[in-house]
Curated annotation (Swiss-Prot):
Keywords: Cytoplasm, RNA-binding. This is SsrA-binding protein. It comes from Christiangramia forsetii (strain DSM 17595 / CGMCC 1.15422 / KT0803). HAMAP family: SmpB. Required for rescue of stalled ribosomes mediated by trans-translation. Binds to transfer-messenger RNA (tmRNA), required for stable association of tmRNA with ribosomes. tmRNA and SmpB together mimic tRNA shape, replacing the anticodon stem-loop with SmpB. tmRNA is encoded by the ssrA gene; the 2 termini fold to resemble tRNA(Ala) and it encodes a 'tag peptide', a short internal open reading frame. During trans-translation Ala-aminoacylated tmRNA acts like a tRNA, entering the A-site of stalled ribosomes, displacing the stalled mRNA. The gene is smpB. CDD domains: SmpB.
Length: 157
């Protein structure tokens, strides 16, 4: 199957809040079960994973609250923008993730939505542990001190 050059790796939607709110443990790349209009909207870049999370239902993993805008050129047979979408992983990965989530109280967060070289939509997910408030404050302090140092170094060059 041949795809145009503009489509290759052109879509890269990130969850920027996740890095600040969570500490990542393991990362996985999962396929997504999508309708025709959903993949077309994603290829246009009209998706948002900022407030989404993953949840198990009957030993299957679903991404919840991922917003995929309705496809502009579709007729009345369009998709629901906030519907649950099934994630496709290998069985052993699913078992491992489900065990970690139920026993350790960890959560699964989507990090990045992208189109791979074969033109398929993939979702990079991570097993994550929520940061405490003081950890978030420390992250902010570190970032500000790094910016300050960079500014000072720039002045003396």
């Amino acid at each position: 199957m041949y795809f145009c050059g503009y489509m290759k790796n052109s879509i890269n939607i990130k969850n920027r809040k996740a890095k600040f709110n969570y500490e990542f443990l393991d990362k996985y790349t999962a396929g997504i079960k999508l309708a025709g209009t959903e993949i077309k909207a994603i290829r246009e870049g009209k998706a948002n994973i900022a407030e989404s999370f993953c949840e198990f239902n009957n030993h299957e993993l679903f991404v919840i609250n991922m917003h995929v805008e309705e496809y502009s050129h579709a007729t009345h047979f369009n998709h629901n923008p906030r519907s649950q979408r099934k994630l496709l992983l290998q069985r052993r990965e699913l078992r491992k993730l489900e065990k970690e989530v139920t026993n350790s109280g960890l959560t699964i967060i989507p990090l990045r939505l992208f189109i791979n070289d074969r033109g398929l939509a993939k979702l990079q997910i991570s097993l994550a542990k929520g940061k405490k408030l003081y950890d978030k404050r420390e992250t902010i302090k570190d970032r500000e001190s790094k910016r300050r140092l960079d500014r000072i170094q720039k002045e003396y060059k």
